[in-house]
Amino acid sequence: MMILGNLRVATLSDGYGLIPDAAILIEGDRIQWVGPEAHLPPSAAPRHDMGGRLCTPALIDCHTHAVFAGTRAAEFEMRLKGASYAEVAAAGGGIVSTVMATRAASADELLAASLPRIDAMLAGGVGTVEIKSGYGLDIETELRMLRVARRIGQLRKVRVRTSFLGAHAVPPDYRGRPDAYLAEVVLPALKVAQDEGLVDAVDAFCEGIAFSPAQIAHLFAQAHKLRLPVKLHAEQLSNLGGAALAARHDALSADHLEYLDAEGVAALAAAGTVAVLLPGAFYALRETQAPPVAALRAAGVPMAVATDLNPGTSPLGALGLAMNMACTLFRLTPEEALAGTTIHAARALGLSDIGRIAPGFRADLAIWEAEHPAELSWRIGPAPLHVRLHEGEFV
């Protein structure tokens, strides 16, 4: 048991939920009490003076592709020089290049490539990260990616949630045969992943260049049979009704949503599905149509913010910068951005005991060299993290 005293606490219980001159009583991995320090119940627990610093829940990055091999820097240069998507692909770039590099990497090599990315996230105050498969597109590599993600959670003080994203793209060896790919690779891999305890949710990419709503509906039906929750990349490049599809399947989240329409907004609101906004991909792809944040806000749809860390369209590993981008590019408020990387991000992962500072919640905390929580979205640059607690222990 211990006390953190002399804090400004943003509980996220009601807006920022700011409590000045606050203390937090922690027992084991749980918060037992939070409030004005003058009202702290008598306790013999040791007290740590935090010097008047700001305390928030540890941040949650609820959408990443952090396990992969290789880079896509060469095609970045090609695109800047005017190369089309087809020209990049013909030169060996695009998602296929990441798939080939990831397939060729051993588990140890994937782990060695991924850990520095995770370490950078943790240095920015992240305490929970979602990691997807999706760069194997064969049974062996999809499972290897998920095993590496689980290993990361064992090696670092971070909570890792995994999403099986076998339906990310159709690999070259199944070009023109997406149904066969789903039947022969995706569904068998999903079953093995579930049997091995490697998967927390099932994800898919609903887009003309990926999978149709009907194909995804079939995949989600199989996920439900395995008692696995679902989430969906939807309405990023066009509107295929992916958000409404996600809502019909009680998805935890629908992600991207640049081309979301009024029907999709209403469906998300009715289902309680979280809208995950990914400003890094919007920025890197130089998109011009932003998600309909005002409509989502008016409908009461919870909005999360994530990095979408991946080598092709969002090589962004700093969640604080994603918060700034969400405010600057999508017009979220700093309060919404913080909620989007704490309580709403937790909801997008199906987690109900992190993302707020309240009795009974896990003691996943970030203590910052900051006076006000708006500073976390205002800053462009290194996160002002002082120290992080993971399940009640200083990291």
Curated annotation (Swiss-Prot):
4-imidazolone-5-propanoate binds at R72, Y135, H168, Q236, T313. N-formimidoyl-L-glutamate binds at Y135, N310, G312. Binds 1 zinc or iron ion per subunit. GO terms for biological process: L-histidine catabolic process to glutamate and formamide; L-histidine catabolic process to glutamate and formate. Fe(3+) binds at H63, H65, H233, D308. GO terms for cellular component: cytoplasm. Its cofactor is Zn(2+); Fe(3+). Its main location: cytoplasm. Pfam families: Amidohydro_1 (PF01979). It catalyses: 4-imidazolone-5-propanoate + H2O = N-formimidoyl-L-glutamate. One of its GO terms (molecular function) is imidazolonepropionase activity. Zn(2+) binds at H63, H65, H233, D308. Pathway: Amino-acid degradation; L-histidine degradation into L-glutamate; N-formimidoyl-L-glutamate from L-histidine: step 3/3. Its EC number is 3.5.2.7. Keywords: Cytoplasm, Histidine metabolism, Hydrolase, Iron, Metal-binding, Zinc. Catalyzes the hydrolytic cleavage of the carbon-nitrogen bond in imidazolone-5-propanoate to yield N-formimidoyl-L-glutamate. It is the third step in the universal histidine degradation pathway. Belongs to the metallo-dependent hydrolases superfamily. HutI family. HAMAP family: HutI. NCBIfam families: hutI. This is Imidazolonepropionase.
